[in-house]
From Swiss-Prot:
Residues 275-298, 306-326 have a biased composition (Basic and acidic residues). This is ATP synthase subunit b 2. F(1)F(0) ATP synthase produces ATP from ADP in the presence of a proton or sodium gradient. F-type ATPases consist of two structural domains, F(1) containing the extramembraneous catalytic core and F(0) containing the membrane proton channel, linked together by a central stalk and a peripheral stalk. During catalysis, ATP synthesis in the catalytic domain of F(1) is coupled via a rotary mechanism of the central stalk subunits to proton translocation. Component of the F(0) channel, it forms part of the peripheral stalk, linking F(1) to F(0). InterPro entries: Alt_ATP_synth_F0_bsu (IPR017707), ATP_synth_b/b'su_bac/chlpt (IPR002146), ATP_synthase_B_chain (IPR050059), DUF2934 (IPR021327). The gene is atpF2. Residues 275-326 are annotated as: Disordered. F-type ATPases have 2 components, F(1) - the catalytic core - and F(0) - the membrane proton channel. F(1) has five subunits: alpha(3), beta(3), gamma(1), delta(1), epsilon(1). F(0) has three main subunits: a(1), b(2) and c(10-14). The alpha and beta chains form an alternating ring which encloses part of the gamma chain. F(1) is attached to F(0) by a central stalk formed by the gamma and epsilon chains, while a peripheral stalk is formed by the delta and b chains. GO terms for molecular function: proton-transporting ATP synthase activity, rotational mechanism; proton-transporting ATPase activity, rotational mechanism. It is a single-pass membrane protein. GO terms for cellular component: plasma membrane; proton-transporting ATP synthase complex. Its main location: membrane. It comes from Albidiferax ferrireducens (strain ATCC BAA-621 / DSM 15236 / T118).
Amino acid sequence: MLIDWFTVVAQALNFLILVWLLKRFLYQPILDAIDAREKRIALELADADTKRADAKRERDEFQQKNEVFDQQRAALLGKAMEEAKTERQRLLDDARHAADALATKRQEALRSAQRSMSEALSHRARDEVFAIARKALGDLATTSLEERMGEVFTRRLREMDAKAKAALGEALKTASEPALVRSAFELPADQRAAIQNAINETFSADIPLHFATAPEVVCGIELSTNGQKVGWSITDYLASLEKGVDELLKERDKAEPQSELTRQIRKRAYELYEQQGRKEGRAVQNWDKAESEIRKENLSPAKTEPPPEAKAKPKPEEPKPEIGSP
């Protein structure tokens, strides 16, 4: 069998043309469509991965924000509760302090009223006593008594200490006017001369004097010049006594709050004694307990000693201890 090479070549060429046509018009569009679909699927998968990552990130952020919010809410709630508790305690303390201050103020007002009345009575009694004393001494002062006062004055003038004597002598010597000598009664001439001689001898100079009467100089004589003064009279004794009484009253006023505290402790100790019954050694225990309770009311910071009757143990046969009346 002979091979027709022309036919073979033609068939091969025809096959190649067919393959090219199939590839050009059939396979290539299909491949292009497949590639396009693969690219679209890849893009969709990439977009899905991106969205999934974004969703996960947003979820994590949301969870973190929720945790932070819960922590902040718990912190704010705890802070609000603590502030409410603090404010409640502050209001209670303010109310307690206000009540304590009001009670203390009322007690202080009562003590002040009692103290004022006591002071008024004491001062009135003191003034009356001194007024009566001055009037009685003024009525009893006679001319003979004034003469005796003159002798005492001249003696004390000579017995002056050097410093006071020098100051008075300088004032007498430099005075532009006569020195003033005052007495309750008008001095006789001989007594004036005695006083003049005593002054001249004491200060070694001729000192001009002016004698005058002054009812307030009770039973005494007074010499004054240029702001310097020397003398002796019963009025000075009364003034010294009055000053001593004033100091005694001031000391009593200072000690009065302590006495008030002791009075209240006595009262409280007696109440505790009545509540607990009469037992051996109960008085001292009651005193310490009463003092502790009273000090909580801020009545006094000082330590108060129990009275002797509270320190001693009460006898069983006695009806009640001598703690003292409130």
